């Protein structure tokens, strides 16, 4: 037994040990006349003290587990994974279940469960693992979850904070899907009525659609609704991490999934489209790698346009950096999730993000603490060139404050240099060069560079490869 399992077992035994302590306390009270008159401790005080310790220990232990939570936002449907033997799977440690949560599940108290989860909800500490372990103690998990959704009249104001109870509904149904609970005919019929009621509230509200699709997925109601309509709702919730899970669970056929992917591509959402390609088993019909490579170039070009449109001001450079970094981070996640690092060795996406963040920090530092001009000492003559006596140009405060100058390498060489967005600037002190001159013809739009190119060569325009086979 690991240390973690030992701690979890000990916490779960607190109630049992507290009962033994109460029995001993009652025996002691029977001989109260023999005790000191100053002994006035009551059982309620002892019980309150131990309950407080129990809650604190359980909370800290749950927080300790949450530092490396299992990923519940990525579900694979690769058929090859299904054939792997259970012996090769990693065995996750059983999370601790607080006694109050376990008792609610054992009593099939859906309303109490909702109130409890709202009370302890913490955005920084996911509850998926603990709830998944707890609801397994329920004799009728599906009925309990349905009771929680149907009968919840718990108002956020009574908890003293603003909270969307629908988040708890989604969590419970997500866990219900995960454990593949048994669903009786009566429970399914009740869920069907609730699903139709929730469907009437969807309209154009994505989160309402998310709850509705979870009802359909968790209670196996896919055959009760029109598949085309369900597919439209999946497109509406595509941005949520559970979108591919419910899409696979509600029975949307491959043809409609393919149509959904094309719609995402046409709507300018290539990252979401690629997620559906991998997690809905559509990589045999679509080519995700060209889509991602094209996305990288589009991100670079979009950031470059932000700079050019505002004459490469400091503000535009910061906005462009933020825009590109925020666009590349979900790409990095997909590359890691799908083990695609070998496909993007030339693009060096992570290095690009680090470079952008470093350059932004440098610009901020130089703007906050601009270089000070040394006061000119009296009686000293200006330095002149030994050949023609001309004054050697000294970089002015104005030049040093220019964003282009701040982005130049510390040791510049003669000639033209590339700034982080692929535009050329002069390396000669005191000479201002139009960053677009020589790169693009008059009236031409600026062209982007590949991430791996740091030599100053500008590539000719490239046609994007097709997103999917014709």
From Swiss-Prot:
Coiled-coil intervals, chain numbering: 336-369
Lineage: superkingdom: Eukaryota
Any GO BP: flower development
Mutant lacking the gene: phenotype: Reduced levels of FLC expression and early flowering, but not redundant with FRI. Frl1 and frl2 double mutants flower earlier than frl1 single mutant, due to a partial redundancy.
Tissue: Expressed during seed development and in dry seed. Preferentially expressed in the chalazal endosperm during early stages of seed development.
Assigned keywords, A-Z: Coiled coil, Developmental protein, Differentiation, Flowering
Stretches for region Disordered: 355-400
Stored InterPro entries: Frigida
Record field: compositional bias (Polar residues): 388-400
Function noted in UniProt: Required for FRI-mediated up-regulation of FLC transcripts, but not redundant with FRI and only partially redundant with FRL2. Required for the stabilization of the FRI-C complex.
Stated family: Belongs to the Frigida family.
Further details from the record: In cv. Columbia and cv. Landsberg erecta, either FRL1 or FRL2, but not both, is functional and required for FRI-mediated up-regulation of FLC.
Subunit: Component of the transcription activator complex FRI-C composed of FRI, FRL1, SUF4, FLX and FES1. Interacts with FRI and SUF4.
Protein name: FRIGIDA-like protein 1
Species of the source: Arabidopsis thaliana (Mouse-ear cress)
Gene: FRL1
């Amino acid at each position: 037994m690991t240390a973690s399992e030992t701690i979890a077992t000990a916490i779960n035994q607190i109630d049992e040990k507290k009962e033994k302590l109460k029995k001993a306390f009652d025996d002691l009270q029977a001989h109260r006349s023999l005790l000191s008159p100053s002994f006035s401790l009551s059982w309620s005080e002892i019980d309150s003290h131990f309950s407080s310790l129990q809650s604190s220990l359980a909370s800290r232990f749950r927080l300790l587990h949450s530092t490396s939570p299992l990923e519940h936002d990525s579900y694979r449907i690769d058929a090859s994974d299904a054939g792997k033997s259970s012996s090769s799977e990693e065995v996750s440690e059983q999370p601790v279940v607080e006694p109050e949560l376990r008792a609610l599940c054992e009593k099939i108290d859906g309303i109490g469960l909702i109130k409890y989860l709202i009370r302890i909800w913490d955005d920084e500490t996911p509850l998926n693992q603990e709830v998944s372990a707890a609801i397994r103690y329920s004799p009728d998990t599906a009925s309990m979850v349905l009771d929680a959704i149907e009968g919840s009249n718990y108002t956020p104001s009574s908890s003293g904070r603003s909270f969307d109870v629908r988040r708890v509904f989604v969590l419970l149904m997500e866990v219900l899907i995960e454990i593949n609970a048994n669903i009786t005919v009566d429970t399914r019929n009740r869920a069907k009525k609730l699903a139709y009621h929730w469907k009437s509230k969807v309209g154009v509200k994505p989160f309402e659609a998310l709850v509705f699709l979870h009802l359909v997925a968790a209670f196996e109601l896919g055959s009760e609704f029109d598949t085309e309509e369900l597919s439209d709702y999946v497109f509406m919730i595509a941005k949520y991490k559970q979108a591919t899970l419910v899409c696979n669970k509600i029975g949307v056929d491959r043809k409609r999934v393919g149509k959904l992917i094309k719609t995402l591509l046409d709507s300018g959402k290539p990252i979401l489209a690629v997620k559906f390609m991998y997690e809905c088993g559509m990589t045999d019909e679509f080519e995700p790698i060209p889509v991602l490579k094209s996305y990288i170039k589009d991100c670079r070009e979009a950031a470059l346009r932000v700079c050019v449109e505002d004459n490469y001001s400091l503000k535009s450079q910061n906005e462009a950096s933020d825009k590109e970094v925020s666009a590349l981070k979900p790409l990095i996640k997909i590359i890691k999730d799908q083990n695609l690092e070998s496909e993007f060795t030339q693009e060096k996406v992570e290095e690009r993000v680090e470079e952008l963040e470093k350059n932004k920090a440098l610009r901020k530092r130089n703007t906050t603490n601009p270089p000070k001009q040394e006061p000119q000492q009296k009686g000293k003559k200006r330095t002149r060139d030994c050949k023609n006596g001309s004054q050697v140009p000294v970089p002015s405060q104005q030049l040093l404050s220019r964003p282009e100058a701040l982005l130049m390498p510390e040791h510049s060489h003669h000639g033209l240099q590339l700034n982080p967005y692929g535009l050329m600037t002069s390396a000669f002190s005191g000479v201002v060069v139009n960053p677009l001159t020589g790169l693009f013809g008059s009236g031409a739009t600026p062209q982007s560079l590949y991430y791996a190119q740091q030599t100053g060569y500008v590539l000719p325009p490239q046609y994007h490869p097709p997103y999917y086979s014709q």
